[in-house]
C-alpha cells in the first residue's frame, strides 16, 4: 500500500493512517499463515468484513481489523501461540500479561510500535499496533441455561471491570506520587544550587 495521502468518500486518509494499516495487514498475513499451517478456521468480522466486500479493503475511517474464530479453533491457536509468534509479533491474552489485560479475546501486536487507545493510558501492558481476534462460543438452547450463562458472564464482567478500575486508580495515584517526588527533588536541587552559588560568592 502506498503511503500517499488521499481522500476516499470525502474522508481524508493520512500517510500515518496508511502506515498503521500496513502494519495491521502484516499482522493479518502472519496470523493467516499460522492458521493455514494448523488448519484453523478464521474469517473477517464487523467493519473489516464490510470494508472487504464494499470498499475492497479498509473502510476509509476504520483503524482496526476484526477477525473471529470458533472456540475449538481459537483454543488450538492459543496452544500454539508461544511457538508460532516470535518477535516482532506478540500474541496477547490475559495469560501473557502480568497486569490486568481487560479483554476476553486475543490481540496480535507488533513489537516496536505504539497504539494507545483512549482509557488505556495507564495500562502496564504491551500497547503496540494490533489486530483483534474474537472468539465465538456456543449458546445453550434451553432458555433457563441461557439466562444463567448470561448472568454468570455479567457477574464476571463486573468483577473484572472493578479490578481493572482499582488497578488504574492505584497506578494513577502512584504516578502522581512519583511526579510529586520528582518535582520536590528538582526544587531541592535548585535550592542547593542557589545556596552554593550564593555562598561561593560571599567573602568569609
Task: State what each model feature region is.
Residues 4-6, 12-38, 81-141, 158-204:
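Conserved catalytic core of two-metal-ion nucleotidyltransferases
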Residues 68-70:
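Short hydrophobic/aromatic beta-strand micro-patches
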Residues 32-65, 74:
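Active-site nucleotide-donor binding segment shared across nucleotidyl transfer reactions
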Residues 142-149:
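A short secondary-structure junction signal
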Residues 150-157:
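A contiguous, mid-domain pocket- or channel-lining segment that forms the substrate-recognition surface
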Amino acid at each position: 500500500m502506498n503511503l500517499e495521502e488521499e481522500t476516499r468518500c470525502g474522508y481524508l486518509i493520512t500517510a500515518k493512517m496508511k502506515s498503521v494499516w500496513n502494519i495491521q495487514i502484516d499482522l493479518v498475513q502472519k496470523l493467516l499463515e499460522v492458521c493455514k499451517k494448523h488448519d484453523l478456521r478464521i474469517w473477517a468480522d464487523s467493519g473489516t468484513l464490510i470494508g472487504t466486500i464494499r470498499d475492497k479493503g479498509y473502510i476509509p475511517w476504520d483503524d482496526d481489523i476484526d477477525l473471529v474464530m470458533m472456540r475449538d479453533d481459537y483454543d488450538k491457536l492459543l496452544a500454539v501461540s508461544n511457538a508460532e509468534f516470535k518477535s516482532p509479533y506478540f500474541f496477547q491474552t490475559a495469560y501473557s500479561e502480568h497486569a490486568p489485560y481487560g479483554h476476553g479475546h486475543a490481540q496480535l501486536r507488533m513489537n516496536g510500535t505504539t497504539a494507545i487507545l483512549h482509557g488505556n493510558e495507564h495500562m502496564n501492558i504491551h500497547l503496540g499496533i494490533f489486530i483483534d481476534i474474537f472468539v465465538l462460543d456456543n449458546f445453550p438452547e434451553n432458555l433457563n441455561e441461557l439466562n444463567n450463562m448470561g448472568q454468570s458472564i455479567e457477574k464476571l464482567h463486573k468483577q473484572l471491570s472493578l479490578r481493572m478500575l482499582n488497578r488504574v486508580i492505584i497506578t494513577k495515584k502512584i504516578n502522581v506520587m512519583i511526579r510529586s517526588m520528582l518535582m520536590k527533588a528538582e526544587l531541592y536541587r535548585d535550592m542547593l544550587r542557589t545556596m552554593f552559588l550564593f555562598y561561593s560568592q560571599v567573602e568569609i
